[in-house]
Amino acid sequence: MNLGLAILLIVLAFAGGVALGIYLSRRQVENYIADKPILDENALRLMMSQMGQKPSEAKVQQVLRQIKSQQKVASKKK
């Protein structure tokens, strides 16, 4: 009986560690992306110019605000 209990405790500890590791790493990645977005102003300007649009400062800032607001809405849903 002691061997079965030991195996059960080891399996439960392993499963708990995996679940905690997944949760913490996901939270860390979400915080990193929120602090340092992947799409910055220069990348957005380059993308707009490749699509044939003239990237004015007002348009770039408008698109960045839209992206940030969508990220906030998406993070609140979770």
From Swiss-Prot:
State the superkingdom. Answer: Bacteria
The record's family statement is: Belongs to the UPF0154 family.
This entry carries the following GO cellular component terms, namely: plasma membrane
InterPro entries named among the record's database cross-references:
UPF0154
Query: Any stretches that span the bilayer, and where are they?
Result: 3-23
Subcellular locations according to the entry:
Cell membrane
Taxonomic path: Bacteria, Bacillati, Bacillota, Bacilli, Lactobacillales
Q: What is its main location?
A: membrane
Membrane protein topology class: Single-pass membrane protein
Give the keywords, sorted.
Cell membrane, Membrane, Transmembrane, Transmembrane helix
The keyword Membrane appears for this protein? yes
Protein name listed in UniProt: UPF0154 protein SSU05_1707
